């Protein structure tokens, strides 16, 4: 899967714009892919990555990037898995800096508002700088993520802070239907 290693995390390995794959012939077992449409379709329906051809294009392309799991799963495609994995690595590295550091608290043992906002902004900035700015997240006004920390968490009693990070993935046009007809005025 050399293509996966050479493209950004949000990119689908089957993107037609990236061009065809290098092999000039591909096989499923001993049969050419071109002659095994039913077998290829059956394998694809089970959630496996398979090659395909397009009318009007030369060469082979990956049909999509499924993960061989329930198609409704959030991580049913390699694109989403790679995006969330990268966000996880950035969040881990960013929040690790805060581990065992002193935290200014309110009288009830909760984090002070300014500390919460600082942590939220630090993580959002890291994700936006390393992912959103590179086009790896779908964004509005440069923001491709949202971080939330509940200020009511009692750090003194639990020594634990739960941080919620949500990233906005891209969508993919897996199907395009064109409604074609004549444009004529009724006489």
Show the residue positions of the predicted features.
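A glycine- and small-residue-enriched flexible loop/hinge signal that marks low-structured segments
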Residues: 1-103, 138
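C-terminal edge-of-domain segments
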Residues: 150-187
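Histidine (H) residue identity feature
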Residues: 75-77, 113, 170
């Amino acid at each position: 899967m050399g293509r996966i290693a050479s493209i950004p995390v949000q990119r689908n390995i089957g993107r037609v714009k990236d061009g065809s794959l290098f092999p000039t012939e591909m096989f499923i077992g001993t049969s050419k892919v071109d002659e095994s449409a039913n077998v290829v379709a059956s394998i694809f329906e089970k959630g496996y990555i398979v090659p395909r051809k397009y009318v009007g294009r030369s060469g082979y392309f990956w049909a999509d990037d499924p993960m061989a799991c329930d198609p409704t799963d959030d991580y049913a495609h390699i694109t989403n898995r790679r995006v969330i994995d990268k966000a996880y690595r950035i969040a881990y590295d960013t929040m690790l800096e805060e581990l065992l550091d002193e935290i200014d608290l309110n009288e009830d043992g909760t984090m002070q508002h300014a500390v919460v906002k600082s942590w939220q902004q630090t993580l959002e900035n890291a994700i936006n700088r390393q992912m959103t700015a590179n086009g790896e997240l779908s964004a509005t006004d440069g923001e491709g993520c949202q971080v939330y920390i509940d200020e009511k968490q009692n750090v003194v009693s639990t020594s634990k802070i739960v941080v919620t990070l949500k990233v906005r993935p891209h969508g993919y046009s897996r199907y395009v239907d064109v409604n074609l007809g004549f444009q004529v005025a009724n006489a």
